[in-house]
């Protein structure tokens, strides 16, 4: 198994509606990306978040699935409208 972890800082001016659209969009990737078996995303409640307000974990069956995730057309469609809204940090790991 492999995991993709992420956290986002919102850029100035991002609305609550846009934030909810991001959460919904990420959750909808599951079932559309081969090998993506679990998606957890939520609002950060930690006082140690350093400005990162949204975080999540995605679990993939294997390295090939993880590698195929980023260029997948469904993911790229999300990225096209998501990136102008966020300052992301990402970590991938084998578990």
Residue map of PLM features:
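A cross-taxonomic marker for long C-terminal extensions/tails that follow the last structured domain
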Residues: 81-85
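A common structural junction motif
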Residues: 28, 74-80
């Amino acid at each position: 198994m492999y995991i993709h972890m992420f956290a986002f800082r919102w850029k100035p001016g991002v609305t609550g509606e846009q934030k909810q659209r991001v959460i919904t969009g990420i959750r909808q990737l599951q079932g559309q990306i081969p090998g993506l078996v679990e998606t957890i995303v939520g609002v950060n409640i930690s006082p140690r978040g350093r400005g990162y307000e949204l975080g999540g974990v995605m679990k993939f069956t294997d390295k090939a699935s993880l590698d195929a995730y980023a260029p997948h057309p469904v993911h790229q469609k999300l990225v096209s409208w998501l990136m102008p809204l966020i300052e992301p940090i990402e970590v991938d790991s084998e578990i």
